[in-house]
A protein has these predicted regions:
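Core catalytic lobe of class I
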Residues: 1-226
C-alpha cells in the first residue's frame, strides 16, 4: 500500500515505542528509520511508583530513501532577534556560523583547503565564494582573524522544527468529539505538511475521531479510512 516515496507515521505511548521500532526495523530496515518525535502532551496524573508521563512518541519510517519530506520552520522571536548585533552595511541583525571544519579528517576536501587572512583550514566554501562574502560584508572575524559567516535573520526561513514538539497543546474543547485518543488538528496538520504534499493520499487504518480526514481536507490531501 505504501508508495516508494511514502512514509509511515505511528503515534504511540513511550512504553511500547521500542516494540514498534523493532517491528518496523524488521519490515523496512534500520536505515529507513527517520525520527522518533517527542510530543509534549502535558498530563497531571500522579504516580507514586514512577515519574508521570507527559509526552507521546511519534515514530516515522520511510519505505525507501526517496521518501517525501518538507522541512518546516517556526518564526523567530522578535525579542530574541533584537539581542543579536546589527550589521551597519546591510541594516539587518545577524547570527553567525563557522566557515571552516574542525575535523577535516572526517571528510577530506583538498579542493577546499587554502589560506585565508593568514589561516590555513579546510573551509566550508570555496575561495571564490569566501572572497565574494568578504567583499559583500558577510563575514565577521574573531580576535584571531578567523572568519565566520553572517546569517541574517531576515534572509532565513526561521527556526527549523526538530524532533521535540512542545508548541502544540492537547486537544482543545471546541475540537472534542468524545473520542478517547483524539489528536489535535494542529498536530495532524504538522505531520501531513512535513511528510506529504497537495494531492497526496493519506491512509488512517484506525480512523478514530476522523481528525486526519479534517486535516486532509484543510490541506488539500485525499484520505482513506478503514
Amino acid at each position: 500500500i505504501l508508495k516508494k516515496n511514502g512514509n509511515i507515521i505511528i503515534h504511540v505511548e513511550a512504553k511500547i515505542s521500542h516494540h514498534i521500532r523493532y517491528i518496523c526495523d524488521k519490515i523496512f530496515g534500520e536505515a529507513r528509520f527517520k525520527n522518533e518525535i517527542i510530543w509534549k502532551t502535558g498530563g497531571n496524573a500522579k504516580n507514586k511508583n514512577q515519574l508521570g508521563r507527559s509526552h507521546d512518541n511519534i515514530i516515522v519510517y520511510s519505505k525507501t530513501n526517496k521518501s517525501k519530506f518538507f522541512p518546516m520552520y517556526k518564526p523567530y522571536d522578535i525579542e530574541d532577534v533584537e539581542k543579536f548585533p546589527m550589521c551597519p552595511h546591510h541594516n539587518m541583525r545577524y547570527g553567525n556560523s563557522a566557515a571552516h571544519t574542525c575535523h577535516p579528517e572526517v571528510n577530506p576536501r583538498p579542493n577546499l583547503r587554502y589560506t585565508w587572512n593568514g589561516h590555513y583550514h579546510q573551509w566550508l566554501i570555496c575561495e571564490e565564494k569566501m572572497k565574494s562574502l568578504h567583499e559583500d560584508n558577510r563575514l565577521v572575524y574573531n580576535k584571531k582573524g578567523i572568519p565566520r559567516i553572517k546569517r541574517f535573520f531576515e534572509e532565513q526561513s526561521g527556526i527549523p522544527i526538530r524532533d521535540l514538539w512542545d508548541d502544540i497543546s492537547s486537544i482543545q474543547s471546541k475540537e472534542k468529539t468524545n473520542y478517547a485518543t483524539q489528536k489535535p488538528i494542529k498536530l495532524l496538520n504538522r505531520i501531513i505538511n512535513l511528510y506529504s504534499e497537495k494531492g497526496d493520499l493519506c491512509l488512517d487504518p484506525f480512523a478514530g475521531s476522523g481528525t486526519l480526514g479534517r486535516s486532509c481536507i484543510n490541506n488539500e490531501r485525499k484520505y482513506i479510512f478503514y
